[in-house]
């Protein structure tokens, strides 16, 4: 008998390329039929067949308070009643900018956009306009959205589909993108010594989350800061995923590094489409209408998205919020690691704040090459066994996972118990 998930996927493929609107959702990496989600609440989602899952995807990061949090839903309802979009400034977007500037000391001015891709694309253009240089440095396996110049040896969906770069990206774009190994500061230093006067920016996920979770080695981020300062390049932290997810000031707060520009998304939209980029005042003053670097958007600063984002951020400001979130993630990775040891399965796991990574390898990877060496077939088997048991992990070995404030210890222990059965 055909399930509703299967029927919907078949139907979707007739009108949507691959049946999905973002490639990783297609389950191509793990095989099988994607789950079509009909509703979500707290730490759970329900698919088209009515099956419930404890959710560790969390809309790929935004659902930090859990799904359908009453405060966020009410904020969206109230904003929608006042009007969905105006194409004009609003007080709420000023409030959002002021809040983000207050929460992240590196941000002196900020511009709201409609997605993380828009944020990183605009930050790169701004860095080029500010410096008068063309070249950028990025790192293999780090994903910064689907802008052309950033789709060279990127992570996330490109890794899932086994492609180092996207088709349709002109060679000239790739020519201005220098791709180096994440966590290899010597490579960065060599490039700066050879062509430092041509480098406009270094863009990095300060904690990588799109080749699974990879933390920076000691001194790596500090070295990037030093080199960018020395050569006059703009240091861009892509905190679309990590911003307000790993701590109250993102990775930059945890590691004490001040970037020149920061890109944000996900949590700051509370589940609605939103992005932002901001940083030093002298750089941000180059953006139109103040300066020559153009950026615009019909729905930038959407009043409904901003309302959701403000509600989401206010929830994270509760005392002990991030300590509790980190404890939940640590409980999960410790539990999964323990049952894998019991089963004799090569496995490792790590977490930071409300993010976690699981790897079918004997040690936690520190580089793209080490991630690629993990046992992806073992991950695929684990994914499907856990899915069948009602636990929804990211459908790719190259994606980080997320816990929310709605995950209770009982949820975590239920997942660990299911993993014990699946790994036998």
Curated annotation (Swiss-Prot):
Is 4Fe-4S given among the entry's keywords?
Answer: no
Per its record, the protein catalyses: (S)-4-amino-5-oxopentanoate = 5-aminolevulinate
One Pfam family cited in the UniProt record for this chain: Aminotran_3
A GO biological-process term: protoporphyrinogen IX biosynthetic process
Q: At what positions is N6-(pyridoxal phosphate)lysine found?
A: 266
Q: Name one GO cellular component term.
A: cytoplasm
Please provide the record's keywords in A-Z order: Cytoplasm, Isomerase, Porphyrin biosynthesis, Pyridoxal phosphate
* Cofactor(s) essential for the protein: pyridoxal 5'-phosphate
Pathway field: Porphyrin-containing compound metabolism; protoporphyrin-IX biosynthesis; 5-aminolevulinate from L-glutamyl-tRNA(Glu): step 2/2
E.C. designation(s): 5.4.3.8
Q: Where in the cell is it found?
A: Cytoplasm
The answer to keyword Isomerase applying to this record is: yes
The record's principal subcellular location, in a coarse class, is cytoplasm
Subunit composition and interactions: Homodimer.
Family note: Belongs to the class-III pyridoxal-phosphate-dependent aminotransferase family. HemL subfamily.
Q: Which HAMAP family match?
A: HemL_aminotrans_3 (MF_00375)
Q: What is this protein called?
A: Glutamate-1-semialdehyde 2,1-aminomutase
